[in-house]
A protein has these predicted regions:
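Active-site-adjacent structural elements that line small-molecule/cofactor binding pockets in enzymes
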Residues: 1-144
Length: 144
């Protein structure tokens, strides 16, 4: 994708992806294209982020996120890349922080190094979704 995002006429021949000269537009507004985030949770994430990605985007499901972030930073440094420019985003829902702990959990995630929290809104009727969006909006105002 980065070839396509950054070159007027892109061509790439790799192990898994192979394409002849091609053009694609419009190009992303952000120079170099948007960051590529690894959206997975496995033992291979640190190596794959270090080799291919600009950051990590897990679901906050009670896993050892602190350990994973440290492993990613270590692997990125081992590959000679700056660990200070990584993008750590996380996806969460109200159900993952029960008992009114959502604000505290967001604070915990920020302390771990996440720079973006995205909220999942379950598929439902608008009259069920709007109260959830209102709660998220009120919460977001506390952090901006």
């Amino acid at each position: 994708m980065k070839e396509i995002w950054t070159k007027a006429l892109a061509e790439y021949h790799g192990k898994f992806v192979n394409f002849e000269p091609t053009w694609c537009g419009p190009k992303p507004a952000q120079a170099g294209g948007p960051p590529v985030l690894m959206g997975a949770q496995s033992k291979w994430v640190p190596q794959r982020v270090a080799e291919y990605c600009d950051g990590w985007f897990p679901v906050d499901a009670g896993d050892d996120l602190a350990g994973s972030i440290e492993a990613i930073r270590s692997e990125v440094a081992r590959h000679g890349r700056s660990k200070d420019v990584l993008d750590f985003s996380v996806l969460m829902t109200e159900q993952l922080a029960p008992g009114g702990r959502l604000e505290a959990r967001i604070q915990d995630l920020i302390k771990l190094g996440f720079n973006r929290v995205l909220f999942l809104v379950s598929a439902a009727r608008p009259d069920e979704q709007l109260p959830v969006l209102d709660r998220y909006a009120a919460l977001i105002r506390k952090f901006v």
